[in-house]
Amino acid sequence: MSFVKEFNALCDRFRDPKTRIEAERKLLEFRKSRNVLEQSINVVVSKNATGFAKFQATSVCRDVALESWMRIGTQKQNTIREHLITYVVTNYNDLEKFVSKQILHTVASFYKRAWTSL
């Protein structure tokens, strides 16, 4: 099973009150995984990801990137920011509004952090 399908399934379990606690634990584990930024961005830009999965992946990307902002370096900061803004601008009409708003909020947070880091 691809990671995007697994993440979709995890997000579905997160929305179900019966399986929410276990799914939340797995989402928290995902935030600590090795390639979390790359994986979360892959979910965001995937055509197979659900809107809720894209929303959650964007939240993970934002939180992890901001927590490790100085460690990830300027080049990676710029790459993530530009990749997300390009994606949302290119696909704006196809994205659910709550997803595009979350991505734009994340990009704005990254620009603000970069500006305050000067």
Residue ranges and their predicted role:
Residues 1-118:
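Alpha-helical solenoid scaffolds in large eukaryotic transport, assembly, and signaling factors
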